[in-house]
Curated annotation (Swiss-Prot):
Residues 11-20 have a biased composition (Basic and acidic residues). Keywords: Early protein. Belongs to the orthopoxvirus OPG052 family. The lineage of its organism: Viruses, Varidnaviria, Bamfordvirae, Nucleocytoviricota, Pokkesviricetes. InterPro entries: Poxvirus_F8. Induction: Expressed in the early phase of the viral replicative cycle. This is Protein OPG053. It holds the Pfam family Orthopox_F8. Residues 1-10 have a biased composition (Basic residues). Residues 1-28 are annotated as: Disordered. It comes from the Viruses.
Length: 64
């Protein structure tokens, strides 16, 4: 890791690799699974298949 510029480039590459933006959860999903989809969460297989989400959804806020 040489500097902040390199980290920024890797973040840009990760954004390009995502095939489509993830749609926000519907009200039914929020009621069923809870509202904290952006928090680190371990999902069961049924939810993974239904929502096409990865098994572990992790959200790391950028450091301030």
């Amino acid at each position: 890791m040489e500097g902040s510029k390199r980290k920024h480039d890797s973040r840009r590459l990760q954004e390009q690799e995502q095939p489509r933006p993830r749609t926000p959860p519907s009200y039914e999903e929020i009621a069923k699974y809870g509202h904290s989809f952006n928090v680190k969460r371990f999902t069961n297989e049924e939810m993974c298949l239904k929502n096409d989400y990865p098994r572990i959804i992790s959200y790391n806020p950028p450091p301030k």
